[in-house]
Amino acid sequence: MAVIKCKPTSPGRRHVVKVVNTDLHKGKPFAGLLAKKTKSGGRNNTGRITVRHVGGGHKQHYRIVDFKRNKDGIPAKVERLEYDPNRTAHIALVLYADGERRYILAAKGMKAGDPIQSGLDAEIKTGNARPLRNIPVGSVVHAVEMKPGKGAQIARSAGAYVQVVARDGAYATLRLRSGEMRKVPVDCRATFGEVGNAEHMLRQLGKAGAKRWRGVRPTVRGVAMNPVDHPHGGGEGRTSGGRHPVSPWGVPTKGYKTRSNKRTDKYIVRRRNK
């Protein structure tokens, strides 16, 4: 993995910082694990914008990634690592002994030819998956389920990981990167190690167009809008907005707590660090 700062041969190249991984597959992805991906432009079925700053971008296929890791007892081998445009992490194409291929998240240090396995008897080794009840306390894991059999939801992005800090009865306690301590059922699965491509955070796109290639549209400041569009809009000349910062719908944006899910409050042992 190399971090390359581009020479300023043009204004668009001046600030570009690339992260280059020579171990990634240079050919096409495995066709049997691709799905069609239709762009919405941030609109719902009525045609109204429900997600701002979304639209355009290069056409992409979705890679079907195995987040459940439920193929127990069958050894597999990593065939190759691939780039995935749909996520910050890289993915690994694995070939099982019975001939099936699946994509999984590429863990830190994973390379082509590595053996992996999932199940109760899987070795304690990066890339192997086990239920939390069979993972030693203190282990660093990623791709953690929140409900048994649902598929991984926690620690899936580049460089992410959580630590198993305790196990009591039907629940294991995890320490998340944010500092939050959360309980998860011990029958949920997790994968040993960290997610790879941690250098992703060092990347700099360098120009607005690179964001547009990724389907991200510009963000307009509220004070630059009209009063009909935003609470900060309007006024003669430049203004400060005239009030504490709020969203277009009037919700305070600076540190205001918006979490309201009492059903799952009991699973949070400690809120995240501020």
Swiss-Prot record:
GO BP term (any one): cytoplasmic translation
Transmembrane segments: none
PROSITE patterns: RIBOSOMAL_L2 (PS00467)
Function: One of the primary rRNA binding proteins. Required for association of the 30S and 50S subunits to form the 70S ribosome, for tRNA binding and peptide bond formation. It has been suggested to have peptidyltransferase activity; this is somewhat controversial. Makes several contacts with the 16S rRNA in the 70S ribosome.
Oligomeric and partner information: Part of the 50S ribosomal subunit. Forms a bridge to the 30S subunit in the 70S ribosome.
Family in the record: Belongs to the universal ribosomal protein uL2 family.
Protein's recorded name: Large ribosomal subunit protein uL2
Lineage: Bacteria, Pseudomonadati, Pseudomonadota, Gammaproteobacteria, Alteromonadales
Gene that this polypeptide is encoded by: rplB
